[in-house]
């Protein structure tokens, strides 16, 4: 499990404020791809184009990288829910996508 410190506090739907995410990549299963794809849809509906968070793997949608990291955060951070993804700052979204690349996909 890796810890990501947020650039700004995040207030969850339950009212709790958090300053870091626990990314539990080891807990991810193939069925979590459905959740990641839902997050990709949410991201796509909220912004034009993709989040460009690196060029390590141009074949993997940058939004999917961010979504996979967020699903890992949901698995590891108590109280974090899928609807909290749109509250994450752009800086944190970019960094989460890079975290996914370096700590999960190319570990």
Task: Go through each PLM region and give its residues.
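Short, surface-exposed, charged amphipathic helix/loop patches that serve as local interaction elements
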Residues: 1-107
């Amino acid at each position: 499990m890796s810890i990501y410190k947020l650039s700004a506090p995040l207030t969850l739907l339950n009212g709790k404020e958090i300053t870091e995410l626990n990314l539990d990549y080891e807990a991810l299963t193939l069925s979590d791809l459905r959740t990641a794809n839902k997050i990709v849809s949410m991201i796509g509906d909220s912004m034009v184009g993709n989040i460009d968070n690196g060029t390590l793997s141009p074949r993997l949608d940058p939004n999917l990288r961010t979504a996979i990291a967020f699903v890992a955060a949901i698995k590891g951070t108590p109280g974090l829910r899928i609807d909290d993804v749109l509250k994450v700052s752009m800086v944190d979204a970019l960094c989460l996508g890079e975290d996914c690349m370096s700590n999960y996909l190319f570990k």
